[in-house]
Amino acid sequence: MKLKTKIVAIALGLVASTSLVWSADRPPREATPTIQGVWQDTRCRANCESGECLESPIPALSTFHSDGTLTAYTNPPGTGPLDTPEAGVWQREPGAQNYSYHDISYFYDENGAFSGSGQVTANVHLTSANSFTSSDTIAVYDADGNLLFTFCGHATATRFE
């Protein structure tokens, strides 16, 4: 009989202590900001040394997906209505809140014929949970894949919520 009493007492003690632990209010976890999500960008062609904009900035939308892919859309001067959105990949880089991405978009002439591509390589730094800046290199290729020219870019962005 004593053994049964001890077992019941131990079982009741475990149930009571487990209930207390499960019901205790826990503070919410502090989530480290990440680049994942939708961003409203302002992009410009920039001086490669100073990062200063050389032309009027243009708006863009970028989405960084949790699987390391990204999609973006902008329509800078000189592009046509048949150009594709940007598609690419992103990754975390060493250091606090540093990322990089590489993407591509295709260009088509007014007749719908493929005329080349543009590739963006960017280094991104989250300046807060809801903003980032980037330094970009843009390469433009003809339809045969020959490099036509490169230039630098700069962007600032805010998270779309």
Regions found by a protein language model. Name each.
Residues Y99-T133:
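Acidic, glycine-rich flexible loop segments
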Residues A9-S19:
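Bacterial N-terminal signal peptides
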Residues I138-E161:
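Edge beta-strand at a domain terminus
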Residues E52-N98, Y106, S131-F132:
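N-terminal glycine/threonine-rich, aromatic-flanked beta-hairpin/loop signature
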Residues V21-S23:
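Boundary at the C-terminal end of the N-terminal hydrophobic targeting segment
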Residues M1-A9:
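Bacterial N-terminal signal peptides that target proteins for export
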Residues A31-C53, G88:
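Tryptophan-anchored aromatic micro-motifs
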Residues D41-N47, D67-P76, Y101-Y108, S135-Y141:
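Generic short beta-strand segments
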